[in-house]
Amino acid sequence: MSSVLSVANPAVARAGMVQARPGIVRAEIDFLAPGVRRPFTYGHETPPGAPEPTARFVSHAVGIEDVRDRAPLRFEEHGAVLLNSPTQVRRFSDETHVRERYYGECAGIIQDALGADRVLVFDHNVRRGSALPVQAERRDLGRPVHHAHTDYTPRSALERLHRELGPHAEERLSRYLQVNLWRPIRGPVRDAPLALCDGGSVAREALRRVELRYPERTGEIYYLVHESGQRWYFASEMAVDEAWLFKNFDSAPTGAGRVAPHSAFTDPRHLHAAPRESIEVRALAIFR
């Protein structure tokens, strides 16, 4: 059973924190550079002899508000919610164990949080901070991503739905969402914490489609262009029994928080923290 987490963090601010005001950290996030036509990138390293990616980034300093110092975020309004969500799984380096045990646990957490009729967990990523080695042969291991993005667009979310439930599946549903459940493997998280952009502050035109090329297929994601009205949040000192649940796509035609772009960031208060280790699963939440 999971619940919305609203307990304040009692940690006292250290001297020398780089903050805009209490509860807000000022940090750099990379955004898609404006004016890039037909941006594309690769899901892994650029293949030998292939064109260089056209997606280019610009860094902006943004204020990132600690959710422990404010009212809890609401999933339908903001596109994200922080859950108090204990896990019984600890062997996150064992991919088979994760698929057999953790996927079902996550499906139950998401279904409980959203009231969905069905939840299909279809893949996951384990991410490690830059100081930890990454096994090159493990496609589920990677570095924290330090640019603002969503994992799906309307087109790629529909393709995923068809892949999981067959052609025309959307015609049998009242609503479907693509969501991520993100949690630390070790805590507290100080290195590369996850920042989420309030979905209600994201203009549609700030979301730009980017072609994501893999050896076997081509997908599509959104990169975010910076705008001054965007509001960013994070949860300080996240523990293993906490998890972010956030939207990458929502088929509902209205609602403020249709998506919640996300990015890792470097917290200037913790430049020498232990490298982050985290796992995120991606899932479809189905409403009949």
Residue ranges and their predicted role:
Residues M1-V18, V25:
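Intrinsically disordered, low-structural-confidence terminal and linker regions
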